[in-house]
Amino acid sequence: MAEQTKVKTLEKVVIRFSGDSGDGMQLTGTIFSNLSAVFGNEISTFPDYPAEVRAPQGTLSGVSGFQVHLGSRKIFTPGDKADVLVAMNPAALKVNVKHLKPNAIVLIDTDSFKKSDLDKALFTTDDPFTELGLTGVQVVAAPISTMVKDGLVEFGLDNKSALRCKNMFALGLVCWLFERPLEEAMHMLQNKFAKKPVIAQANIKALTDGYNYGNNIHASVSTYRIESKKAEPGFYTDVNGNKATSYGLIAAAEKAGLQLFLGSYPITPATDILHELSKRKDLGVITVQAEDEIAGICTSIGASFAGCLAATSTSGPGLALKSEAIGLAVIAELPLVIIDVQRGGPSTGLPTKSEQTDLMQALYGRNGESPAVVMAASTPTDCFDAAFWAGKLAVEHMTPVILLTDAFIANGSSAWRIPEMDKYPEIKPNYVANYQDEKVWKAYRRNKESLVRYWAIPGTEGFAHRLGGLEKDY
């Protein structure tokens, strides 16, 4: 084994993984981000994939990417231009040339840079780097596809299945370049493919082969070390905004002593909240995938009336459809958390792109005088606190709360220190059992100190009542 010539220490680096939509760049970037978070680096990530139906393989329209910014100090954004680009084909190189620093490192699969591949990406010469003016970049080239197929013969996989592992070979190269141990990545792959052990072992073999290839063949290339950030002791993980939002709602329900209910309809980029909470039946979470946006929020209003911490998740188009039901929650004075993960454009717009343009809709997009609390999260990790406080405000003030995030925050991830729950305040519902007044109780009787309507859970003896959308005089 040849010795490495030198190791350079960096404070931060931006890495961009890019290839066809089927090349597994999202998984590759996610695993490397998790490795970096476990290692103790600060991270910020941004998955970038087309809004259109999957384009033909190897074309410019079909390029998918994942960018991670990591460092030994506080990282606030996924970064602008990349120090390292993993380009699985010529289209990925061409699409991302504008995102590259002049002296960047580019890792390529030479098997995917043949003339037919260059033609698909609309190159006019057989030298894409010169054609793009990338004379200052350092190229780390490897016949990834060939090596993966040869290395996985023992597993008896067909050609297509074997090539699906080439992203792990590329990940192994990046792990070698940044001195990342492979054990945690192997563990992640075993969990990812727990029901397909042969696929798990094939991916682990490709990962190891990529690392060894870099270590043995490219020994003249400098490797890089990014020290772990000196951080507060505790347990850390890599979390995206949708997952943090889900955990924040669970924490709020726990602090309130309530069961969490989510009634939702799948919509990009909010669907992962429904997916995440549906996994937590062990914590008593109830999820309903309704037939449409209106049904989703109406099931949540019913659950709130029945005594749950109720929530619904959506994006801009869905928030428009839910507006009348939000008005129902306002007039009924029921606690409800509405999560709007904002996306681009009016109408269907750009489902996979990010905007922050729903504020006016959240504030004023309902008929009549229909006030509601509106909050916004600022980072993926901030989504936990924002969701917790949204739940607290909704329950303690008997009101709908709209929590705004966006696709950038929801899909991007950061290193997150898992908080101790004893540092969060209790959530105290204004139950009707606390009602003390000479007047006969009616549905809109209020706590004299807070002016909050009492919450009468169905089944509470002596407090049978009805609520609806018609204005009442009591």
Show where each model-derived region lies:
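Conserved thiamine diphosphate
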Residues: 79, 134-137, 141-145, 353-402, ...
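A glycine-rich phosphate-binding loop feature that marks nucleotide/adenosyl-phosphate handling sites
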Residues: 49-50, 189, 206, 227-230, ...
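Glycine-rich, charge-decorated loop segments at or immediately adjacent to ligand/cofactor-binding or catalytic sites
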Residues: 116-122, 151, 323, 346-352, ...
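Active-site cofactor/cluster-binding pocket
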Residues: 1-256
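Thiamine diphosphate
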Residues: 12-100, 247, 260-261, 268-364, ...
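Flexible, low-complexity linker and terminal segments
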Residues: 231, 239-248, 256, 386, ...
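Glycine-rich phosphate/pyrophosphate-binding loops
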Residues: 45-49, 180-185, 314, 398-409
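Gly-rich Lys/Arg/Thr-decorated short loops/hinges at beta-loop-alpha junctions or inter-strand turns
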Residues: 12, 150-153, 219-234, 252-259, ...
